[in-house]
Regions:
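Hydrophobic, aromatic-enriched interface-forming segments
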Residues: 119-125
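Conserved G/P- and acidic residue-centered "switch" motifs that form tight phosphate/ATP-binding loops
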Residues: 116
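A short, structured beta-strand/loop element
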Residues: 216-218
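N-terminal beta1-alpha1 cap of cysteine-dependent amidohydrolase-like domains
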Residues: 1-113, 124, 131, 135-174, ...
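Active-site-proximal beta-strand elements of phosphoester/diester hydrolases
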Residues: 220-223
């Protein structure tokens, strides 16, 4: 493994939740492990505290940003959507922390990799909108995991194919044109954000991957959980390794 002094600092988005009367900021261990290997970066947890008046700008020190999945959904107010159905889980603190941070990272050309909720945050940060409940749309299938599955291997098993855009970034990184991916999301991209391009779609037309059009900026979002299962599949490993390479390049250029 590379010397720690040469490894990039990669911010990982945390979620705020409560346990009893105590608020917590949490990150699933699988995201931390994915940054340690195969990305070979140093994971830095970014707490969801911007709603409490924090003035810390994490883009000042990170060399990359990993947007994690979450049980929560982006609030419709962030993209001028209709109010959520009662009972929909939201994380106000994460929305107020991560969406502005994504925009600052794009301005500074800091590499970004978004997973599941992360691709949705990237799309909203770029001015796009979301389908709040894909499973309610007549021409779409249910992209959620089975509610009765509590076994990780079954929950994260491949659920459907995606068709990868020929000649696109994801195609160039992985060399693949069609693969099976897991599927654990209720929301999905509706209107594509500014300066984003489609990298992959599901059989029902739901956007499964996007990238930033600017060749000088690495920003890739995927709708599946590329970090799981472990060991990471070869297809997903290529994504993380490329992300790590982009983060190292950013860190080196920052020193110049």
């Amino acid at each position: 493994m590379e010397d720690a002094k040469r490894r990039p600092l990669i911010g990982i988005s945390a979620c705020r939740s409560e346990e009893g009367i105590h608020p917590f900021n949490r990150v699933s261990e699988k995201y931390i492990l994915a940054i340690l290997d195969p990305t070979c970066g140093i994971p830095i947890i970014i707490p969801a505290i911007q709603d409490m008046g924090s003035e810390i700008d994490h883009s000042d020190y990170i060399d990359g940003l990993l947007l994690t999945g979450s049980p929560s959904n982006v609030r419709p107010v962030e993209y001028s959507g209709t109010p959520s159905v009662e009972g929909t889980k939201h994380d106000v603190a994460r929305d107020k922390t991560m969406i502005p941070l994504i925009r600052r990272c794009l301005q500074k050309k800091i590499p970004i990799l978004g997973l599941c909720l992360g691709i949705q945050e990237l799309n909203v940060a770029c001015g796009g909108s979301l389908h709040q409940r894909i499973f309610d749309l007549e021409d779409k299938f249910d992209h959620r995991m089975r509610r009765d599955e509590d076994d990780h291997a079954k929950r994260y098993r491949p659920a459907h194919n995606i068709r990868i855009t020929e000649g696109g970034l994801l195609n160039k990184i992985t060399g693949e044109e069609e693969v099976n991916v897991n599927s654990l999301h209720a929301q999905g991209i509706d209107q594509l954000g500014d300066d984003l391009t489609i990298e992959a779609v599901a059989p029902d037309g739901i956007i499964e991957a996007v990238s930033f059009k600017n060749a000088d900026q690495f920003a890739l979002g995927v709708q599946w959980h590329a970090e799981w299962p472990r060991p990471i599949r070869s297809f997903n490993e290529k994504i993380f390794r490329h992300f790590g390479k982009e983060c190292r390049s950013y860190a080196e250029n920052k020193k110049i």
